[in-house]
Design a protein with these regions (language model features):
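Nucleotide/phosphate-binding catalytic cleft detector across ATP-hydrolyzing
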Residues: 1-153
């Protein structure tokens, strides 16, 4: 069964939305890595709990800065592990993924996001600007000739 997935790659948190179930994941955008070999020790909430409590060879990374990917390899690992955790990939059906992006990202950053989503198992990847997705999410008709204001405060 193919599922439609929405992902908000936030600097602080990652949210994953399924069309039929709503928000199914809301965890910190963090990855704990063993710097000696590059192994992922923990992601999300488990990585957050490790902040300031790890030996020097284990560091907690923030792979997203200002809403965009700062470290593509770590972001790919983060997305891949969350997809495995949620069991949203299968050999036979790859999900369509809509990813919210800031309005001011560059084409290089867009390509990095698409690359990360494809590597974690996405079939068709769509990027939409966060304000547009927020407006649709609260039920605004974005195609009507009536003006609306969407304010994103974090």
């Amino acid at each position: 069964m193919v599922r439609d997935i929405g992902i908000d790659l936030g600097t602080a948190n990652i949210l994953v939305f399924l069309k039929d179930r709503g928000i199914i994941l809301n965890e910190p955008s963090l990855v704990a890595l063993d710097e000696r070999n590059g192994d992922v020790i923990a992601v999300g909430e488990r990585a957050y709990q490790m902040v300031g409590r790890t030996p020097k060879e284990i560091n907690v990374h923030h792979p997203l800065k200002g809403g965009v990917i700062a470290d593509i390899a770590v972001t790919e690992q983060l997305l891949e592990l969350f997809m495995q955790k949620l069991n949203l990939n299968s050999w036979f059906s790859k999900p369509d993924i809509l990813i919210c992006t800031p309005t001011n990202i560059t084409t290089v950053e867009q390509k990095a996001i698409i690359q990360a989503a494809i590597k974690c198992g996405g079939r068709n990847i769509y990027l939409e600007e966060e304000p547009k997705v927020a407006a649709v999410g609260v039920g605004l008709d974005i195609f009507s000739p009536i003006g609306n204001m969407v304010i994103d405060i974090g």
